[in-house]
Design a protein with these regions (language model features):
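One-carbon transfer enzymes
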Residues: 1-246
Length: 246
């Protein structure tokens, strides 16, 4: 095997995709190793999965941080280098509110949490950051501090639909309810929007009249566990770079 890239993983829940990645590198199917697992949820079972394999873990309790900052003036609490106008100009998430004050509060509070997350990650140098069921939208403040080379994005996400169809939290459910005959999953680079980054890989499955939401999810998850390691391997081989349109 070639030189193994260092992969950091962020999760929010059970960590089944994390387990698939761990299994892939422990069986030498990918040129990678997981150097840390972090979560916004201190109770995430995926942290225990990582600990069983001796992988360092940490948790940044987003919910507690956001609750603590709610209703407080945050101008003096935001991290050094945070520029609200720059963040607002770059972000392409759907409008969070028509209330400018609430929008500003949202991005300031997330930057405060992200600064804590970045500080935790400093202890574990990494080449690629993988979101494996991390249920927080990353702001430009965070993304720009990980993606320091415009030609080489370093944050991957996996999404439960064939993007660009059905972005958002529950892609399998949306796919099923829309009546699609084909479902699937997508691995993409993370950009300033929600599930709008460059697509790296996709896998599809048939949806039959006998399928339910649960069986659709089951089919999708099995493909996710194949697709994510494959896309990490493409990154490890240096085959993923961003090129400007000619």
């Amino acid at each position: 095997m070639a030189h193994k890239i260092r992969v950091g993983v962020l999760i929010s829940g059970g960590g089944t995709n994390l387990q698939a990645i761990i299994d892939a590198y422990r069986s030498n199917r990918i040129d990678a190793r997981v150097v840390f697992v972090g979560s916004d949820n201190p109770e995430a079972y995926g942290l225990k999965r990582a600990q069983k394999h001796g992988i360092p873990t940490f948790a940044v309790d987003y919910q507690a941080i956001i609750k603590e900052t709610r209703g407080r003036p945050l101008e003096d609490l935001v991290p050094e280098g945070f520029d609200l106008e720059t963040v607002l100009a770059k972000q392409r998430v759907s409008p969070l509110s028509s209330d400018r004050t609430k929008v500003e509060q949202y991005f300031r509070s997330r930057a405060i949490a992200e600064a804590v997350l970045l500080k935790e990650m400093e202890a574990y140098p990494f080449d690629l950051l993988v979101l494996a069921g991390f249920m927080r939208i990353l702001t430009p403040y965070f993304i720009d501090r990980v993606n320091t080379d415009p030609s080489q994005p370093r944050i991957m996400n996996i999404h439960p639909s064939l993007l660009p169809s059905f972005p958002g939290q529950d892609g399998y459910c949306d796919t099923y309810r829309y009546g699609c005959k084909v479902g699937g999953c997508t691995v993409h680079f993370v950009d300033y929007g929600e599930d709008t980054g460059r697509i790296i890989g996709q896998k599809a499955f048939e949806i039959t009249p006998d399928d339910t939401i649960d069986t659709v999810r089951e089919k999708g998850l099995k493909l996710e566990w194949q697709l994510y390691p494959e896309c990490i391997q493409l990154f490890a081989e240096g085959r993923l770079r961003m090129e400007k349109p000619s």
